[in-house]
Amino acid sequence: YCTLGIPMLQGYGLSEASPVISSNCPQRYRFGSSGQVVKPLELKICDETGTEVKKGEKGEIVIRGKNVMKGYWKNEKSTAGTIRDGWLYTGDRGYLGEDGSLFVSGRFKSLLIAGDGEKYSPEGIEEAIAELSPYIDYCVLYNNQSPYTAGLIVPNKTALTEYVKQREEEPGTVEACKLMLTKLNEELMKFRKGGMYEGMFPERWLPAVVGILPEPLTAQNGTVNSTSKVVRHKVYEVFREELDFLYTPEGKDIRNPRNTKNMK
């Protein structure tokens, strides 16, 4: 946007903080960051034990100030888990740059966790896949100490139907569905070695297996909220069967019978 002459200044906030925590401004901004912490708000980055870490080290974003809520209405349990000794534990992961700029990297509850314990925030990958591929509406990644990362995909069936028509295949047939799945695989391979977006993300966190969801993500099934943001734990819950299938020998091939059926 800045290249086009449209200034866009990123910030960060929560409803629990009324809501602004940090922001860039025209006089001082740093691309990729959420800017400087609003005064007189206090902010620190803490590790899993609640100990403050050094600048540049990632951890949970923790804040304190008069703008922080006193608690959740009639929900003492949630309040106790969020506010401790006057500090609000946001549940967001990030770090502070040397100049004090805040960088937000994702939600702790959404972290991918590999079998060796390494962790990674999936949001950037998921957003890039959906934004850069016209054939994918949603991508939700999963790895909970698993041998590889799985991807749950909501395809753009309108775009894929047009794609198979251009290749003179009749939409709805098994062959057309397999052609759609092959195209989706090609889109995902663009993020791997030799692809258009090679190096954008570490390959171990890219989806090694893909499941096509049998229905869209909607507010009705609870998988997205009122602002169309993915409710990750609900996606895992609603589509548990599809997710488990991806860790079977049959599920490793994107053109498996289950995916083929869900493409119709």
Locate each region found by the language model.
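AMP-binding/adenylate-forming catalytic core of the ANL superfamily
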Residues: 65, 70-71, 93-205, 216, ...
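Conserved C-terminal "lid"/linker of ANL adenylate-forming enzymes
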Residues: 138-142, 147, 190-264
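Gly/Ser/Thr-rich phosphate-binding loop
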Residues: 1-29, 134
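Short coil-to-beta-strand transition motifs
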Residues: 36-40, 88
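A cytosolic small-molecule/anion-sensing beta-strand core signal
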Residues: 39, 98, 226
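Conserved ATP-binding/catalytic segment of the ANL
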Residues: 44-56, 60-114, 255-263
